[in-house]
């Protein structure tokens, strides 16, 4: 089986991972950090700046990296789920969580994924699905995925529902 990767930032990664893991055709998920400049960041590094909650300076995004079987689930279906899971019109915020680590982002792994993600955003905008707000989701090339600490992996599966926007 040849799998492909997809990486999404849609707020607190605990609930996002649980939602994607439940989709038939998704073969593996991992939560982590992507899109910042610090190497091998910790959760504390991503969520704080100078000991205070990170509310301004861009840093890594909390993301879910997904392995999926394209014979069983398309990238387009994963994009549909991504836009259902969170509010792509809120800048650096999802539910009660706010800071740049919670920004809406699609990290594409191929030119085809980039084109499909941009086309999906355009279609949603034309459809007016989120009007009067505008979609602020970033569509950027995948960078180094820094796997989050073990206690974050499958967090809701291990601990049950927590304070998460999903």
Regions found by a protein language model. Give the residues of each.
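Flexible coil/turn and secondary-structure edge motifs
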Residues: 1-166
């Amino acid at each position: 089986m040849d799998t492909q990767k997809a990486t999404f930032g849609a707020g607190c990664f605990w609930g996002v991972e649980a939602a994607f893991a439940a989709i038939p055709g998704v073969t593996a998920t991992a939560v982590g950090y992507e899109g910042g400049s610090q190497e091998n960041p910790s959760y504390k590094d991503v969520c704080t700046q100078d000991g205070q909650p990170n509310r301004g300076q861009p840093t890594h995004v909390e993301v879910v990296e997904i392995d999926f079987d394209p014979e069983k689930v398309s990238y387009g279906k994963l994009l549909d789920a991504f836009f259902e899971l969170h509010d792509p019109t809120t800048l650096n915020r999802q539910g009660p969580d706010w800071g740049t680590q919670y920004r809406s982002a699609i990290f594409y792994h191929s030119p085809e994924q980039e084109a499909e993600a941009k086309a999906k955003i355009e279609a949603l905008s034309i459809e007016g699905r989120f009007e009067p707000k505008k979609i602020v989701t970033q569509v950027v090339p995948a960078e180094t995925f820094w796997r989050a600490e073990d206690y974050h992996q499958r967090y809701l599966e291990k601990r049950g529902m927590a304070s998460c926007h999903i």
